[in-house]
Amino acid sequence: MSKEDAIEVMAVVIEPLPNAMFKVELENKHQVLAHVSGKMRKNFIRILPGDRVAVELSPYDLTRGRIVYRYK
């Protein structure tokens, strides 16, 4: 999947899960599982419940995503 195919949406982190996974709620009230992108993990970006994040969703599986940005 190329980066152009990904759907980027805003979300709020609901709860942290093991292995750098998070349950996030999208703007349209759907809940999906999201993992932290490699660059955020490399730079030790902390994500806490309540944070607003940008999530990339694959058009093939809309129940899983990748957290690509944490807003201040």
UniProtKB/Swiss-Prot annotation:
PANTHER family membership: TRANSLATION INITIATION FACTOR IF-1, CHLOROPLASTIC
Domain spans labelled S1-like: 1-72
Listed name of the protein: Translation initiation factor IF-1
CDD domains: S1_IF1
Pfam family, one: eIF-1a
Keyword list, A-Z: Cytoplasm, Initiation factor, Protein biosynthesis, RNA-binding, rRNA-binding
Compartments, record wording: Cytoplasm
UniProt keyword DNA-binding present: no
Role description: One of the essential components for the initiation of protein synthesis. Stabilizes the binding of IF-2 and IF-3 on the 30S subunit to which N-formylmethionyl-tRNA(fMet) subsequently binds. Helps modulate mRNA selection, yielding the 30S pre-initiation complex (PIC). Upon addition of the 50S ribosomal subunit IF-1, IF-2 and IF-3 are released leaving the mature 70S translation initiation complex.
Gene name linked to the record: infA
InterPro entries in UniProt: NA-bd_OB-fold (IPR012340), RNA-binding_domain_S1_IF1 (IPR006196), S1_domain (IPR003029), TIF_IF1 (IPR004368)
Description of how the protein assembles with itself and partners: Component of the 30S ribosomal translation pre-initiation complex which assembles on the 30S ribosome in the order IF-2 and IF-3, IF-1 and N-formylmethionyl-tRNA(fMet); mRNA recruitment can occur at any time during PIC assembly.
Signal sequence annotation: none
GO cellular component: cytosol
A molecular function GO annotation: rRNA binding
Family per similarity comment: Belongs to the IF-1 family.
UniProt organism field: Koribacter versatilis (strain Ellin345)
Domain of life from the UniProt record: Bacteria
